[in-house]
Amino acid sequence: MRVLLFLLLSLFMLPAFSADNLLRWHDAQHFTVQASMPLKAKRVWKLCALYPSLKDSYWLSLNYGMQEAARRYGVDLKVLEAGGYSQLATQQAQIDQCKQWGAEAILLGSSTTSFPDLQKQVANLPVIELVNAIDAPQVKSRVGVPWFQMGYQPGRYLVQWAHGKPLNVLLMPGPDNAGGSKEMVEGFRAAIAGSPVRIVDIALGDNDIEIQRNLLQEMLERHPEIDVVAGTAIAAEAAMGEGRNLKTPLTVVSFYLSHQVYRGLKRGRVIMAASDQMVWQGELAVEQAIRQLQGQSVSDNVSPPILVLTPKNADREHIRRSLSPGGFRPVYFYQHTSAAKK
């Protein structure tokens, strides 16, 4: 019997979860645990995936999970990236490319918070919402955690880590009106409410290392009292580098995991990172698409559990379903052949 679990924050690392248990979110704070079910593709389906960008290793790891699942289940996969956030016109054109290719389902990692005329454009093609929510009525299933939680977990960790000491935090949640930035800020605010942890400023900008580095330098000049940077993985990477130039190194917390953030955890440069297990999410997106195409039962949303990673527990076992292997390069097209399945 499924049990509705209220959000007890230690829950995300509970060993009582089976390795393959999934979460179905009822809202940003409540979820149900559900078992992962076996799956077999009945034929070679054609899936087309859209990402905002592969500049961020978050999407690179998700891409790895997708191509692994495509190989495992014997389906074709085409991948298109928009080159950044707020690229609605580009992604609309890419959906047309997917249709011309003969895609039977769209796996949509949107670069915007809404996707006007999606129903008109995709017609009867199933759409799996990937990571970033667009609240479109025609989307029947979403793969991804509430971004509220990806801000809440780091905020809660900081409050505990500070032991009552005041902290001055710069938030760098990524692009404005895209990628869950607003929800992560809301989650962080909720977590630190009533504590001496204070948000000094919020710096919004695209997930590009130069943009994030310039934002950080501007904010440090404007607010020299900043001692903590909490934000996207790329913001964390910028903060790790900037810390070398300061008398007192910045404390760095990341809202999600990347390869650089993982190295920062191992070296003690990052004190905490949340992980929504991107490789696993890529696999789930392919599985949800196959199920929907085969007329099987599909949950309206599904995600892996969120991991809270620190220098003490950041090891290969904890990240095996989060990060793509070292040296992995983006796969833009995978075509199933009989030889590929052997």
From Swiss-Prot:
It comes from the Bacteria. It is found in: Periplasm. Residues 1-18 form the signal peptide. InterPro entries: Peripla_BP/Lac1_sug-bd_dom, Peripla_BP_I, TMAO_TorT. One of its GO terms (cellular component) is periplasmic space. Keywords: Periplasm, Signal, Transport. Belongs to the bacterial solute-binding protein 2 family. Upon binding a putative inducer it probably interacts with TorS and allows it to play a role in the induction of the torCAD operon for trimethylamine N-oxide reductase. This is Periplasmic protein TorT. It comes from Escherichia coli O157:H7. The lineage of its organism: Bacteria, Pseudomonadati, Pseudomonadota, Gammaproteobacteria, Enterobacterales. The gene is torT.
